[in-house]
Amino acid sequence: MAFLEDGNHTAVTEFVLFGLTDDPVLRVILFIIFLCIYLVNVSGNLSTILLIRVSSQLHHPMYFFLSHLASVDVGYSSTVTPKMLANFLLERSTISYLGCTIQLFSGAFVGTLECFLLATMAYDRFIAICNPLLYSTKMSTQVCIQLLVGSYIGGFLNASSFLLSFFPLLFCGPNRVNHYSCDLTPLIELSCSGSNVPIVPASFCSAFVIIVTVSVIAISYTYILITILKMRSTEGRQKAFSTCTSHLTAVTLYYGTVTFIYVMPKSSYSTDQNKVVSVFYTVVIPMLNPIIYSLRNNEIKGALKRQLARKIFS
């Protein structure tokens, strides 16, 4: 049942998701494409986690955070992709109010966690390159755990702000969401609350997270660049660049799409463009991250070669 009478209002108990397209042929094609992307994402990120766990040479803070980033990428994609794949095969794509709440919270939680982890990894690179003699002290196991716990707490608090924005919304009629998942912006557009006040907590917290994490990343890489330019050894420069370029590529891809969604004025792009960009950072980027880190990082490539050689000759 999609509606429930409540006094003078008709409460919505489920939502209908528009998805990406109504074309039945295109839906089958997209199902195959996104299924392949999801399988590559899960296998690639789980392989990254396993490689870091079994390779003693990767037991460093940078790869400790990278393994958690890989876990987040699997979780990020899994909040959206399975439901999206099912919807491609259904004539009418629905999600319950509770399911929508869970998807909204989960997406905000892992998305925020990714921001904090990327910022933490930038700080780790800053300490490693700019203060190498203090690295073992400033990035001790205890400090790494504290940074990780802080990231999870930050993710939980920001996701909670999304619920504070979502729960006051009244849905008294239409229940068709112009999106492939439960995203806050189209839900607010669908609401009959008639006020922009509910979106304030989520907007404020999201802006705070983006400003803080981008500032940490920008300041860290400014000092890193200055330090690298002062290096006299060409080999030292190349090693420093090799450990930073993969992370910087991941940061650029992720924050580029997040900025498009949350910073650019809504009037500058359509809802369909919003959906395409959202697919990129929730589905495509999590698949690309393990590829970026394996292709651009010499330590990852070296560890992978050693593990493969060990398997072949064992």
From Swiss-Prot:
Function: Potential odorant receptor.
Cysteine pairs bridged by disulfides in the record: C100-C192
GO CC aspect terms: membrane; plasma membrane
Residue ranges annotated as Extracellular topological domain: 1-28, 79-102, 158-199, 262-274
Glycosylation sites: N8
GO annotation terms (biological process): G protein-coupled receptor signaling pathway; sensory perception of smell
Major place of residence: membrane
Protein name per Swiss-Prot or TrEMBL: Olfactory receptor 5P51
Superkingdom of origin organism: Eukaryota
Membrane topology: Multi-pass membrane protein
Keyword terms, alphabetized: Cell membrane, Disulfide bond, G-protein coupled receptor, Glycoprotein, Membrane, Olfaction, Receptor, Sensory transduction, Transducer, Transmembrane, Transmembrane helix
Similarity field: Belongs to the G-protein coupled receptor 1 family.
Transmembrane segments: 29-49, 58-78, 103-123, 137-157, 200-220, 241-261, 275-295
MF GO annotations: G protein-coupled receptor activity; olfactory receptor activity
Membrane side Cytoplasmic: residue ranges: 50-57, 124-136, 221-240, 296-314
One Pfam family named in its UniProt record: 7tm_4
